[in-house]
Amino acid sequence: MAETQTVNPMRKLRLEKVTVNIGVGEAGERLQKAYQLLQELTGVKPVYTIAKRTIREFGVRKGAPIGVKVTLRGKKAEEFLNKVLAAVGHRIKASSFDEYGNVSFGIAEHVLIPGTRYDPEIGIFGMDVAITLVRPGFRVARRRRKKAHIPKRHRTVSKEEAMEFLKQNFNVTIVEG
């Protein structure tokens, strides 16, 4: 009698969020164009990122807006992630994964994303994409009421598990480098 091995549903990984960041490095017209571009690409209103400290060499003051970012969750995150992965050819370097299951990679030009056209008024921007993976039940440690401790074996997502998740769900090829 062959027994089928069941997988614990609480051990399955899921996509928590996709964070998209465009760092401009200065306030002004380019920052407004990056804001407009990110809003068009994602359909979500971006937030401004501000400088943590003054860097005189770059002309950046503490508290000045220097970039825009968007956090996507749920279906929007999956749809945008599929588009962005198509822009990089469904290939991610192994060095893009950290030991907690997060993945980060960059896109040199937003025009590489399928369905995006070049607009001379906006110009060309690069962007950083960060993917966060979690297990179900992770909210227990973050919620406001009745917080509880989550064991380390459930809390951490290994690099190998994250790679396998992206291979299975998004047809990603992991490249050494």
Curated annotation (Swiss-Prot):
InterPro entries: Ribosomal_uL5, Ribosomal_uL5_arc, Ribosomal_uL5_C, Ribosomal_uL5_CS, Ribosomal_uL5_dom_sf, Ribosomal_uL5_N. One of its GO terms (cellular component) is ribosome. GO terms for biological process: translation. Gene3D superfamilies: 3.30.1440.10. One of its GO terms (molecular function) is tRNA binding. Keywords: Ribonucleoprotein, Ribosomal protein, RNA-binding, rRNA-binding, tRNA-binding. This is one of the proteins that bind and probably mediate the attachment of the 5S RNA into the large ribosomal subunit, where it forms part of the central protuberance. In the 70S ribosome it contacts protein S13 of the 30S subunit (bridge B1b), connecting the 2 subunits; this bridge is implicated in subunit movement. May contact the P site tRNA; the 5S rRNA and some of its associated proteins might help stabilize positioning of ribosome-bound tRNAs. NCBIfam families: PRK04219.1. Part of the 50S ribosomal subunit; contacts the 5S rRNA and probably tRNA. Forms a bridge to the 30S subunit in the 70S ribosome. Belongs to the universal ribosomal protein uL5 family. This is Large ribosomal subunit protein uL5. It comes from Sulfurisphaera tokodaii (strain DSM 16993 / JCM 10545 / NBRC 100140 / 7). The gene is rpl5.
